[in-house]
Amino acid sequence: SGALSSDRLWHFEPKSFIRHFRKCSWLDSDVIEKIMVANTKSTEKLQISKISKKVTEYFGAINTIINKYNLYSVNRKCHFLGQGAVESESLLSMQEVSQQQLIENGVHKGGAIVGLSTKKESDLGHWYGELAEEKDDYFSGKKYNSKGNLITGSYSWINGNCGDVDAQKYRGRGFKMLTGLDTYSSYWVYRGWLSINDFDRYWWDDPQYKKKNPPKMKKRFPQIDSPQKITENTYNCLDTGGFFIVGFRGKTVRIMDGDKNGKVDDNQVIENVTSAINGGYKGLAERKIFTKKAKEVIGDDVE
């Protein structure tokens, strides 16, 4: 009859079971939390509590975006989360904050964080800098850290920005810190918030743009009234991250896929992914910590 007798044992073949179970790509909030606190000391209870609350807030959107952008393989998830943990400060900051810039004994240094730059723009009721009294020179000037090391230069005339106002208006926002009018306008078109007929492509190639003279430009640059839409909900915050990697940094996914079963050195792949996303290696040590933790809690290679 084929029935199992009382002295026979039936079980799943372990490796096949794991392969099948892994087809469920949804990550539990506990798993995401372990990744996000990877660079936080166990004694920092308050910080861990803050991160835990943010994980509860964002984990649904994280899973939705991972599936939406086909990032659900183990490698892709690990790198996506490891990189995003650094950009978003473990989900605690979905908008770029500014730092006072000081000169001490002739040396440029970064000072305290500007409090207003940390405030949610949904609470402000507008994008930070829309009011004249909120003008923040951090975004349009050179940026130094507290040790006097140059972080980066002005945002005013890069990434399609058309001056000092744009430098602040299109500051980094979202899980991957979407930055600049170029990337903002592409995302706005993608979401249907802006028509491609409302501006001219490659406006930064206009001779007057190169002269930093927008009023004389013949090419029309995009007009975006509410850049803070990126951070108005958890979905938008994460969606910009998926869009940036797949839409703007497509080769990043191929680099992630090259990280298979320990055949390629972890550090080298993380460095390659970091460079592909950012064009440099800012925060590399932290990116390695978060990505390796993600591999530890998500990865379970089956030969």
Describe the function of each predicted region.
Residues 1-158, 162, 190-197, 202, ...:
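Cell-wall glycan-active module
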Residues 58, 170-171, 180-183, 237, ...:
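Alpha-helical structural motif
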Residues 76-80, 171, 175, 234-238, ...:
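Short runs of predominantly hydrophobic/aromatic residues within well-ordered alpha helices
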Residues 162-170, 232-235:
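A general structural signal for short secondary-structure junctions and capping/turn motifs
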Residues 167, 171-187, 191-198:
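Amphipathic alpha-helical interface segments
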Residues 177-181, 239-247, 275, 279:
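Short, hydrophobic/amphipathic alpha-helical patches that form generic packing surfaces
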Residues 224-232, 278:
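Active-site rim elements
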Residues 229-243:
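Internal mixed-charge
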